[in-house]
């Protein structure tokens, strides 16, 4: 191989390595975003569960009050 071919090969390898490094950094950023979204999703699920329980409690209270009103009438 001539020096010119070796130089071109080296340039291409260097470009490929830089691309790989950039892709690794992007992958790490995406993993971090996914982790953040997963945590947020868990928080929202917990909040949803709490709100569902509160709604059930309020429905039971309202049903009880309506029952009292019906028995008074």
Swiss-Prot record:
The keyword Electron transport does not apply. It is found in: Cytoplasm. The keyword Cytoplasm applies. Residues 3-66 form a coiled coil. Its main location: cytoplasm. GO terms for cellular component: cytoplasm. Homodimer. The ends of the coiled-coil dimer bind to each other, forming polymers. Interacts with FtsZ. Belongs to the ZapB family. Non-essential, abundant cell division factor that is required for proper Z-ring formation. It is recruited early to the divisome by direct interaction with FtsZ, stimulating Z-ring assembly and thereby promoting cell division earlier in the cell cycle. Its recruitment to the Z-ring requires functional FtsA or ZipA. This is Cell division protein ZapB. It comes from Shewanella baltica (strain OS155 / ATCC BAA-1091). The gene is zapB.
């Amino acid at each position: 191989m001539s020096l010119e071919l070796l130089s071109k090969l080296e340039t291409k390898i260097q470009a490929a390595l830089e691309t790989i490094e950039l892709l690794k950094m992007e992958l790490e950023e995406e993993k971090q975003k996914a982790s953040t979204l997963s945590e947020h999703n868990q928080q929202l699920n917990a909040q949803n569960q709490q709100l569902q329980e509160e709604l059930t409690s309020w429905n039971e209270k309202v049903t009880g009050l309506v029952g009292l009103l019906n028995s008074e009438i």
